[in-house]
Amino acid sequence: IIVERIHLVVFPIFVYMLIRAWSLLRLALIGEGLLVFVAFTWSWWRGADFVFGGTAKGVICGLLTAAVLGAVNFYLLVRAPALPGVPSIRRLYAEVMQPMFGNLSVTEIIVISAVAGIGEELLFRGVLQPELGLFPASVIFGLAHMGGGGTLAFGCWVMVMGGMLGILAIASEGLLAPIIAHAVYDAAAMSYIRWDGNERVA
């Protein structure tokens, strides 16, 4: 427990120092831009094209999935009993994500959410899932969102979200739906942290 708490203190300090040197928006644009570059390079090398699917179907399915993911996330943060893993997710939001996202503007939330949805879905659902399969791609997605002690439960939750986004990509026959679901979910999560998280997450 002590080691876990140390990680949860050291990691936010590192993140805060990084954000002071580079704005979070700039980091997001660079990081997600690299993911897009890797995804398109891999796609070009493999001779495969990205399939985005129908617009109406993608939008509707994406919004519905975002609503489900957002509801589950809110339940974990506010309503769920303190089962194993739940307290660590709540601490991660309070001690890491609140300092990171707590002062974002509406424009920053929209842009960061959009580039995250595009970059991560192109790579994980557009490249890794066709190459490795649904489960391995979802596991890697979860691992990519872990950052030290105390983040295992959060990584498992993100892995589940990755699986749902992967199933959504298959069911909707394209990447548009998971991109929308991912972006809308991220926007809702950051908005919650920005305007309501300080009072609820503990």
Task: Label the model's feature ranges.
Residues P12-F37:
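Cytosolic-side membrane-entry/anchor segment at the start of a transmembrane helix
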Residues E32-V38, T65, Y185:
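Hydrophobic alpha-helical membrane segments, chiefly transmembrane helices and signal peptide h-regions
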Residues L8, V36, F124-R125:
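Short amphipathic alpha-helical "recognition" segments used for binding
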Residues V10-F11, V38, E131, A188:
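A periodicity- and composition-biased signal for non-globular, repetitive helical segments
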Residues I2-E4:
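Extreme N-terminal basic, low-complexity initiation segments
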Residues E95-A202:
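Transmembrane helix-loop-helix hairpins at the membrane interface
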Residues I6-F11, L27, T41-A116, E199-A202:
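Juxtamembrane helix-loop-helix connectors linking adjacent transmembrane helices
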